[in-house]
């Protein structure tokens, strides 16, 4: 969608900052343990585990740390059993928000998620209220658009669904289960992406064209991401170029 890469840049900067504090590492390790526990410990046979390992590597988690988390998940420790719950709601300006959590205390989690919404003029919705606006898929991006022909040839041959060119970057779209295969094919061809992830991509966008509302949306998303039980926060917000310029000052 329009503005996708710009919002993604904000998220990735925050992810790198959080990784320094260790918060992202903690959340990713939790997800690796869960993925390994619920599926095959071999990432080549477990698309979910493969996707979260890619996420771990993108924030410079070591292979040793990743392997220990996988081993923990396959060890069957009941202390690692957690509920995976998604919450849905709206922020100011009709921005749809999908919050993925892993928790050992549902009451605590829903209370903290609801507080983040209401404190920032948002509302926690019911199950199904916004989930239909998002599609789970793999996204592999390249900042060098001159690679379009090479990327298209390799990616489509590997089963990618589409390649988008917005004039500034290339976005390879895959089925989430096929994400690892397409990424491997691109890497084997010497086409190393600038970012790659399995995400929940919005089918529509909510336009925010003033800084005040944009700051409220970002504050709400920051509050949600800072909740220990929250794994991922997805939204369909799209900031205008003018708003983006002011936010990045």
From Swiss-Prot:
It is found in: Cytoplasm. Its main location: cytoplasm. Pfam families: TACO1_YebC_N, Transcrip_reg. It comes from the Bacteria. Keywords: Cytoplasm, DNA-binding, Transcription, Transcription regulation. One of its GO terms (cellular component) is cytosol. One of its GO terms (molecular function) is DNA binding. GO terms for biological process: regulation of DNA-templated transcription. InterPro entries: Integrase-like_N (IPR017856), TACO1_YebC-like_2nd/3rd_dom (IPR048300), TACO1_YebC_N (IPR049083), Transcrip_reg_TACO1-like (IPR002876), Transcrip_reg_TACO1-like_dom3 (IPR026564), YebC-like (IPR029072). Belongs to the TACO1 family. NCBIfam families: PRK00110.1, PRK12378.1, YebC/PmpR family DNA-binding transcriptional regulator. This is Probable transcriptional regulatory protein Psyc_0938. It comes from Psychrobacter arcticus (strain DSM 17307 / VKM B-2377 / 273-4).
